[in-house]
Design a protein with these regions (language model features):
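N-terminal leader/propeptide segments of preproteins
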Residues: 1-32, 38, 42
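Hydrophobic alpha-helical membrane-embedded segments
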Residues: 133-170, 272-280
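Membrane-interfacial helical/loop segments at transmembrane boundaries in membrane proteins
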Residues: 231-259
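Cytosolic juxtamembrane regions of integral membrane proteins
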Residues: 2-3, 44-112, 173-198
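Juxtamembrane inter-helical linkers in multi-pass membrane proteins
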Residues: 163-190, 245-249, 294-303
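Cytosolic/matrix-facing juxtamembrane and C-terminal tails of multi-pass cellular membrane proteins
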Residues: 179, 251-264, 271, 276-303
């Protein structure tokens, strides 16, 4: 290893970040958190030694930055291989178009669109209420503690949302928060938190989830309602005509041409096409939303 050994925790973290350059930002955040948590715990456990001495002491147990980075890359590759569904042979034409029904991510992304209305309302209410109470209580002695607790809860919610997005879309999201470092003093930590752009981008994400959740929910529900009603229209007509469930009588639609015999098969075909398009749309929305969430919730890889 040509690089000189780190003499401080900051140097170690910088070297580890450089070794992980180009990797997923969520992976980098997890690796940096684990390393900083371990290193600071070891330094605290040896108050009689300097950081340089502690780093030299644990070099053989925890590893150099390049060794740690390699271990994280190997572990990530194994986890991704285990979690990723087997890749099917590429299809073309109708196979590629209708093959979306065999993609589990299309279904989970559609479920995410339906769930987003509930999570959007919860996140928006949480963010707006927290900010309003923080501003209202700012003149009181409990104002600052309340704001700090609210910010801490915001990061917990952010981490939970990341896990939900990873489960629904497959996009890698952080499994660890960003380490708060070793800022000296209470006010230094507060200032560090306020200067962290993620503090504000996370709040922006939580607030934006309400309009996004409404849009996702409306598109999913309307798309499902129209496509499924078209698909099942012939079955409903047959049931009404033959009285399979104890009711007889034909259905009549307006305008009159909808009552033609050839319309029902066309409606069923249109429903299948609309449902297929909805599944493609849901999968695309899932991917785009995961990129949007990662941009706002994950710490940038550049320090």
């Amino acid at each position: 290893m040509t690089r000189s050994a780190p003499r401080s925790i900051e140097q170690y973290l910088k070297a580890l970040r450089e070794e992980l350059a180009g990797e997923d930002s969520a992976l980098v955040q997890d690796a940096l958190y684990d390393a900083e948590e371990y290193l600071r715990a070891e330094v605290a456990a040896h108050p009689d030694k300097s950081e340089a001495d502690v780093l030299e002491l644990i070099a053989s147990t925890y590893g150099a930055p390049d060794e740690v980075a390699s271990a994280y890359r190997d572990t990530e590759a194994k986890v991704k291989a285990a979690m990723t569904p087997p890749r099917k042979a590429p299809k073309s034409g109708a196979g590629a178009f209708f093959g979306v029904f065999l993609d589990s991510r299309a279904y989970t992304s559609l479920f995410f669109m339906l769930l987003s209305l509930a999570t959007g309302v919860i996140y928006f209410t949480f963010a707006v209420t927290g900010l309003s109470l923080s501003a209202g209580l700012a003149v009181l002695v409990i104002g600052i503690p309340f704001f700090l607790v609210f910010m801490a809860l915001t990061r917990v919610v952010s981490l939970a949302e990341g896990r939900l997005i990873e489960a629904m879309t497959g996009e890698r999201m952080p499994r660890r928060p960003v380490h708060q470092g070793n800022a000296a003093g209470f006010w230094a930590r507060v200032g560090q938190m306020l200067k962290d752009r993620r503090t504000w981008t996370t709040l922006a994400y939580l607030v934006s989830m309400l309009p996004l959740g409404i849009a996702y929910f409306v598109v999913a529900v309307v798309g499902l309602a129209i496509s499924l009603s078209f698909i099942f229209a012939p079955l409903i007509e047959l049931q009404s005509h033959y009285g399979w469930f104890g009711h007889t009588g034909d259905l009549y639609f307006s305008p009159e041409w909808l009552n033609s015999p050839w319309v029902l098969p066309v409606l069923m075909l249109a429903g299948v096409l609309l449902l297929t398009l909805l599944m493609h749309l849901a999968r695309g929305v899932g991917r785009l939303h995961a990129m949007y969430a990662k941009a706002l919730l994950v710490a940038p890889t550049a320090a």
